[in-house]
Amino acid sequence: MTENSDKVPITMVGPEDVEFCSPPAYTTVTVKPSGSPTRLLKVGAVVLISGAVLLLFGAIGAFYFWKGNDNHIYNVHYSMSINGKLQDGSMEIDAVNNLETFKMGSGAEEAIEVNDFKNGITGIRFAGGEKCYIKAQVKARIPEVGTVTKQSISELEGKIMPANYEENSLIWVAVDQPVKDSSFLSSKILELCGDLPIFWLKPMYPKEIQRERREVVRNSAPSTTRRPHSEPRGNAGPGRLSNGTRPNVQDDAEPFNPDNPYHQQEGESMTFDPRLDHEGICCIECRRSYTHCQKICEPLGGYYPWPYNYQGCRSACRVVMPCSWWVARILGMV
């Protein structure tokens, strides 16, 4: 059997055919890695510099923001003697948001009171308590003051102030049911209360105060039926309980009464809303601060007259400043 393929003898392979028999030649090529260390270092340096610049601008912005807000926020720390026990207290006034915050005690005995003058709400919370309390507050209508005497209260810093209680002082008792819709409350009050149920507080007058109020109404009733010849600009109406450390002051039908010492103008003709004084926000005639304590109690559901309708009272104390200083702080003039 003959083979169709032709065989080439080895001896007939010439030099020109050697290149077809030798293995292919490889050229040495230097290949640079895709991620060069120099390039990575440059990228890292750019990232670090950019981050440092951002941090620098952030720090500068935060500094100026803090510096701007610091001009409108005032803090003072003091001590208060309550029933012979010394407790720390602090007061913070936020002029921008019309907020006033008082803290008394520490730990399980801490009480926090936030006065939201913009919305007319006061929030009170006790440490370890299961409820948060709110009550109606006067909306601060800051009057226009031409010249204000700048009163320094540096003496209040670190001072020990006695907290005096009156037997017949006003008592605040929580209602039976919590607030269902809290959308009307400000973010500061909601932050204070957190997840606790919120209860309205209603004023409760002891028997002695109720008797005095009835006598005031009875005595003032004849004066409303006849008009005297020389009548002052403001007629006295039913009495309203004043601040805890001062005697009762009758409420006024008109905003100013020259016969009422709490409405007398001070040295530089500075006038204030009388409700600021009546609600215990500040003291019109005072030249120095004083303490004001209020009792927050739980309803008992018993007979209405005192003391059968409340229980479990706790105290929340604060410092009442002179109205001239208080208004000046809110206006940012001190």
Curated annotation (Swiss-Prot):
Q: Which residues form the propeptide?
A: 211-214
Any one Gene Ontology BP term: cartilage development
InterPro entries for the chain = BRICHOS_dom (IPR007084), Chondromodulin/Tenomodulin (IPR043405)
Kindly indicate whether the keyword Glycoprotein belongs to this entry.
yes
The record lists the membrane-crossing segments as: 46-66
Record note on disruption phenotype: Aged mice show enhanced VEGFA expression, angiogenesis, inflammatory cell infiltration, aortic stenosis, lipid deposition and calcification in the cardiac valves.
Give the signal peptide, or none: none
Q: Where is this region: Disordered?
A: 212-270
Q: How is it modified after translation?
A: After cleavage, the post-translationally modified ChM-I is secreted as a glycoprotein.
> Where in the chain are disulfide-linked cysteines found?
C132-C193, C282-C286, C283-C323, C293-C317, C297-C313
| Residue stretches making up the BRICHOS domain | 105-201
Q: Which GO terms describe its cellular component?
A: endomembrane system; extracellular region; membrane
Glycosylation sites noted in the Swiss-Prot or TrEMBL record: N243
The record's account of tissue expression is: Detected in the four cardiac valves, valvular interstitial cells and extracellular matrix (at protein level).
Q: Which UniProt keywords apply?
A: Chondrogenesis, Cleavage on pair of basic residues, Developmental protein, Differentiation, Disulfide bond, Extracellular matrix, Glycoprotein, Membrane, Secreted, Transmembrane, Transmembrane helix
Matches recorded under SMART domains: BRICHOS
Provide the function of this protein. Bifunctional growth regulator that stimulates the growth of cultured chondrocytes in the presence of basic fibroblast growth factor (FGF) but inhibits the growth of cultured vascular endothelial cells. May contribute to the rapid growth of cartilage and vascular invasion prior to the replacement of cartilage by bone during endochondral bone development. Inhibits in vitro tube formation and mobilization of endothelial cells. Plays a role as antiangiogenic factor in cardiac valves to suppress neovascularization.
Please report which protein family the annotation says this sequence is part of. Answer: Belongs to the chondromodulin-1 family.
State the protein's name: Leukocyte cell-derived chemotaxin 1
Q: Which organism is it from?
A: Mus musculus
